[in-house]
Swiss-Prot record:
Its EC number(s): 2.8.2.1
Subcellular location: Cytoplasm
Record SUPFAM superfamilies: P-loop containing nucleoside triphosphate hydrolases
S-S bridge residues: none
Lineage: Eukaryota, Metazoa, Chordata, Craniata, Vertebrata
Protein name as it appears in the record: Sulfotransferase 1B1
PANTHER family in the record: SULFOTRANSFERASE SULT
Similarity comment: Belongs to the sulfotransferase 1 family.
Entries under InterPro entries matching the protein: P-loop_NTPase, Sulfotransferase_dom
Cellular component aspect of the GO annotation: cytoplasm; cytosol
Catalytic activity, as annotated: a phenol + 3'-phosphoadenylyl sulfate = an aryl sulfate + adenosine 3',5'-bisphosphate + H(+); 3,3',5-triiodo-L-thyronine + 3'-phosphoadenylyl sulfate = 3,3',5-triiodo-L-thyronine sulfate + adenosine 3',5'-bisphosphate + H(+); 3,3',5'-triiodo-L-thyronine + 3'-phosphoadenylyl sulfate = 3,3',5'-triiodo-L-thyronine sulfate + adenosine 3',5'-bisphosphate + H(+); 3,3'-diiodo-L-thyronine + 3'-phosphoadenylyl sulfate = 3,3'-diiodo-L-thyronine sulfate + adenosine 3',5'-bisphosphate + H(+)
Length: 296
């Protein structure tokens, strides 16, 4: 039986060729064998791409914008993370999902080929939120500073190198976004961009409402936009992850919800780092139609 000391600040473990958070890798057989339900709604993202934001949006849509219903529990209970396992600390994502009534919202950061086959077989609806790689790398670095489930990130310079070579949890950002983009050709996947959501939340949330086959009026839509704004969510203890023990997430090092903007990477990248990043990006993304904006 693993204890917290066995999983905190440990090296990543390979799972079918992908680097994975040590704590999550210990539970892989259960994750692979997970049974989906046909009406499950999957939220998939690469880490630090707006997952909690879109999770709360979808929960509000399913509850017709009823804020009181959305206060029924922490985001980790309402929208469990499939692969989340914290031995000796709290309920796993799978255990929580098994308790939740349908339609369940399932959060995951898994690449397409690690997602349990059951989700594909049941033709579950999926929403993928993608964010530009430069902002993701900066946000991920700060996340790994405060998240003790991850290996210590080292300096920003060291971390950026790991990010560019896919030596971070869940592997390469490039592989992740390209494979999910390709998968939408054969599966019901709504592919959204973080930057579009920041720029025009009303239009993007309308896309989610249509995809989920809901019909909500403008008053409810405006309520959802307000309740899920970064400023409101940052101060909402049900969604800002301050409910997790400080042994897991130390908000004194960096808050879970840090800035929620597009373009913050410019405060961290040197000219040389930016040039190197752009060269690698061009090579990796040359054969895809995916288009990202690094600022709004």
């Amino acid at each position: 039986m693993l204890s917290p000391k066995d999983i905190l600040r440990k090296d990543l473990k390979l799972v079918h060729g992908y680097p994975m958070t040590c704590a999550f890798a210990s539970n892989w057989e259960k994750i692979e064998q997970f049974h989906s339900r046909p009406d499950d709604i999957v939220i998939a993202t690469y880490p630090k791409s707006g997952t909690t934001w879109v999770s709360e949006i979808i929960d509000m849509i399913l509850n017709d914008g009823d804020i009181e219903k959305c206060k029924r529990g922490f985001i980790t209970e309402k929208v469990p993370m499939l692969e989340m396992t914290l031995p000796g600390l709290r309920t796993s994502g799978i255990e929580q999902l098994e308790k939740n009534p349908s339609p369940r919202i399932v959060k995951t950061h898994l690449p397409t080929d690690l997602l349990p086959k059951s989700f594909w077989e049941n033709n579950c609806k999926m929403i993928y939120l993608a964010r530009n790689a430069k902002d993701v790398s900066v946000s991920y670095y700060h996340f790994d500073l405060m998240n003790n489930l991850q290996p210590f990130p080292g300096t920003w310079e060291e971390y950026l190198e790991k990010f560019l070579t896919g030596k971070v949890a869940y592997g390469s950002w490039f592989t992740h976004v390209k494979n999910w983009w390709k998968k939408k050709e054969e599966h019901p996947i709504l592919f959204l961009y973080y930057e579009d959501m920041k720029e025009n939340p009303k239009e993007e949330i309308k896309k989610i409402i249509r995809f989920l086959e809901k019909n909500l009026n403008d008053e409810i839509l405006d309520r959802i936009i307000h309740h899920t704004s970064f400023e409101v969510m940052k101060d909402n203890p049900l969604v800002n992850y301050t409910h997790l023990p400080t042994t897991v997430m130390d908000h004194s090092k960096s808050p879970f919800m840090r800035k929620g903007t597009a373009g913050d990477w410019k405060n961290y990248f040197t000219v040389a780092q930016n040039e190197k990043f752009d060269a690698i990006y061009e090579t990796e993304m040359s054969k895809t139609a995916l288009q990202f904006r690094t600022e709004i």
